[in-house]
């Protein structure tokens, strides 16, 4: 007698399971970032690496720990990766839309006298763009987007829908920096070094201001991720990388040897950052409306 095999549709994820996976995404990133920042300098000292090489060691640790871990838990296309062609188009879209928004708002701020551009060294600027892109991509953009706008986002969206996923992903994102400092401090103590700063915000920054900016940044990255139907995570990665680059040129140009010196003529100049993030988010929402007409479904 022939046996009949009835296929049952996969059961929907439980609320607890979805929240657990979402938190796991944040935990993976926090541990990877903490280990990279803590173990990177130790390995650099052992190998005698300095400068860019030392920074790349720390950055590579973060990516090597975070990205393969997530891809063992979920399929690459599920978290938002795609074919090489689609990935490149999505990445360039993220970079292009974000750069355009930043130029528009920062240009307006310059015209209003909020920013004064005093010095431009093209050779130094190009060098900064190359080195900053390599380090920021491995240290932050790729691993953070894979764990958070990738694994955390898809875990929450699949169970709760878009709006709760936006709030949940943003909340988890805001927990990562502080949690990572605990991991870094623990590794530093084991190595006999100064544990350094522990806190929810980088040393010298007001915690509330930092968390508000982080929340706006998260919403912009989610808008980028939701804007495209194919390889959408790469749009968020491109956006993340471009925001880090623009902010470092505008706010930390001299300290980071960017080749550009920017004077903030008014305390209100810092508001240009959240403003251009909002402009970029709106642009991605408009892009989403267009792509949804041509691409069925949504990642």
Region spans (language model):
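Membrane-interface starts of transmembrane alpha-helices
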Residues: 46-58, 160-172, 205, 231-235, ...
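Membrane-interface helix/loop boundary segments of multi-pass membrane proteins
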Residues: 143-170, 174-175, 226-231
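Hydrophobic alpha-helical transmembrane segments
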Residues: 23-27, 91-96, 130-143, 163-168, 201-217, 271-278, ...
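Alpha-helical transmembrane segments of multi-pass integral membrane proteins
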Residues: 27-31, 95-108, 136-140, 165-179, ...
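N-terminal, membrane-interfacial amphipathic/helix-forming hydrophobic leader that caps
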Residues: 1-88, 103-106, 190-192, 225-227, ...
């Amino acid at each position: 007698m022939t046996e009949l095999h009835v296929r049952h549709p996969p059961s929907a994820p439980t609320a607890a399971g979805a929240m657990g996976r979402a938190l796991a995404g944040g935990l993976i990133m926090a541990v990877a970032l903490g280990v990279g920042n803590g173990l990177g300098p130790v390995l650099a000292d052992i190998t005698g690496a300095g400068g860019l090489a030392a920074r790349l060691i720390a950055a590579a640790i973060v990516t090597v720990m975070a990205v393969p871990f997530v891809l063992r838990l979920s399929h690459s296309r599920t978290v938002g990766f795609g074919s090489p062609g689609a990935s490149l188009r999505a990445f360039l879209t993220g970079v292009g839309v974000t750069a355009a928004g930043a130029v528009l708002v920062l240009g307006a701020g310059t015209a209003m006298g909020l920013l004064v551009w005093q010095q431009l060294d093209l050779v130094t600027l190009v060098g900064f763009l190359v080195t900053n892109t390599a380090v920021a991509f491995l240290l932050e953009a790729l691993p953070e987007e894979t764990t958070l706008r990738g694994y955390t986002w898809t875990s929450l969206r699949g169970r709760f829908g878009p709006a709760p996923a936006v709030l949940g992903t943003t909340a988890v994102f805001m927990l990562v920096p502080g949690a990572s400092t605990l991991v870094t401090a623990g590794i530093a103590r084991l190595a006999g070094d100064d544990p350094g700063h522990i806190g929810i915000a980088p040393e010298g920054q007001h915690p509330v201001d930092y968390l508000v900016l982080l929340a706006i940044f998260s919403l912009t990255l989610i808008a980028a991720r939701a804007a495209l139907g194919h390889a959408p995570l790469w749009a968020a990665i491109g956006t993340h990388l471009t925001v880090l680059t623009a902010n470092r040129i505008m706010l930390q140009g001299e300290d980071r040897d960017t080749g550009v010196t920017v004077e903030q003529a008014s305390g209100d100049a810092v508001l240009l950052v959240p403003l251009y993030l909002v402009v970029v988010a709106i642009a991605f929402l408009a892009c989403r409306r267009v792509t949804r007409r041509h691409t069925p479904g949504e990642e």
